[in-house]
Structure formats: structure tokens, C-alpha cells
UniProtKB/Swiss-Prot annotation:
Protein's name according to its UniProt entry: Endoribonuclease YbeY
EC number(s) reported in the record: 3.1.-.-
Function as written in the Swiss-Prot or TrEMBL entry: Single strand-specific metallo-endoribonuclease involved in late-stage 70S ribosome quality control and in maturation of the 3' terminus of the 16S rRNA.
Gene Ontology cellular-component annotations: cytoplasm
Main location, first listed in the record: cytoplasm
Family (UniProt): Belongs to the endoribonuclease YbeY family.
Record PROSITE patterns: UPF0054
Coiled-coil stretches noted in the UniProt entry, renumbered to this chain: none
Gene name linked to the record: ybeY
NCBIfam families for this protein: rRNA maturation RNase YbeY (TIGR00043)
Cofactor(s) the record lists: Zn(2+)
Pfam families linked to this entry: YbeY
Length: 165
């Protein structure tokens, strides 16, 4: 998985940047998204507030904003064409590679790590996986959706070795 990571805050250690890269690659492998691309930007609460207002019409900062990329137009291709022209299938895979972008508030992550009694490292990993699942179509509006998403989230974090401390 290709992941572009930008730290707008200048406050995120190389260790956390590497962990973010590694855990997202691990989550991609667990969910069959290894050939996808995404971006992660670490932001302040102030920037998170601006983005939350712009994209979600919510007037407060939040921990992670997940912007799933959905092309405006579907590309319709005959299945027989894909079988007869494997290069076309490969080209479509490349075209459809970008899945979205996460904005993780470093300030919120620190606040929540303290509030929940676990490490900043664990909270940053949690937010990366949580956002990753959102841009891959998971949500938690209903009890059923929540059970599915949170179950997979915990499975990924535990298998990666990032448990609640």
C-alpha cells in the first residue's frame, strides 16, 4: 500500500510516523487493500476544527476526519473485455487505487490517550485504523455496523500488537 504521510504540526516523532505507516499497511493486508493508496495528515485541533466545519458542518475539533474518495463516475467495462485484455484490468486497478485521506488531530490524540488511560502511541494507532476502516466503507451508525467495525478494528490492533495498556 502506498501511503503519503504529512505532519503539519511538526510534533509527531519518526516512531509514530513509522507506526502509522506500518499499522495501515497491516490493516490493508488484513482487509485485502494492499494495492490501494491513501494519505494521512497530522494536524492541530485548530486545523481539525476548520476541517470538521468544512466537511461535516460540525463546529468543534475532532480526533480523526476520514474523507473517503468516491469517483463521480463509474467506469463500465464488459467482463469479456477484461478477460481478453488483462492490461485493461490492470489499468482499471491503478485508476481505482486511491481510497481517501485521513486528518488525525495530534492534540486530540494526546487528550484522549490521557482520558482513556493508555499511551499516545496506542491512541495514534487506534485513530489510524479507525479512519482507515471509515474510508473503506465501514461505519458505526447502527448497532450492527458498530459491532462489525469495532470488532475488526480491535482484531487489527490486537494482531498488530497495539493493545490497551
Amino acid at each position: 500500500m502506498y501511503i503519503e504521510i504529512v505532519d503539519e504540526t511538526g510534533l509527531v516523532s519518526e516512531e509514530i510516523i513509522k507506526q502509522t505507516q506500518d499499522i495501515l499497511e497491516f490493516a490493508a493486508q488484513k482487509t485485502g487493500k494492499e494495492k490501494k493508496e491513501m494519505a494521512v495528515t497530522f494536524v492541530t485541533n485548530e486545523r481539525s476544527h476548520e476541517l470538521n466545519l468544512e466537511y461535516r458542518d460540525t463546529d468543534r475539533p475532532t480526533d480523526v476526519i476520514s474523507l473517503e474518495y468516491k469517483p463521480e463516475l463509474d467506469i463500465a467495462v464488459d467482463e469479456e473485455d477484461l478477460l481478453n485484455h488483462p492490461e485493461l484490468a490492470e489499468m482499471l486497478d491503478d485508476f481505482d487505487a486511491y481510497i481517501g485521506e485521513l486528518f488525525i488531530s495530534v492534540d486530540k490524540a494526546r487528550e484522549q490517550a490521557e482520558e482513556y488511560g493508555h499511551s499516545f502511541k496506542r491512541e495514534m494507532g487506534f485513530l489510524a485504523v479507525h479512519g482507515f476502516l471509515h474510508i473503506n466503507g465501514y461505519d458505526h451508525y447502527t448497532p450492527e455496523e458498530e459491532a462489525e467495525m469495532f470488532g475488526l478494528q480491535e482484531e487489527i490492533l490486537t494482531a498488530y500488537g497495539l493493545t490497551r495498556e
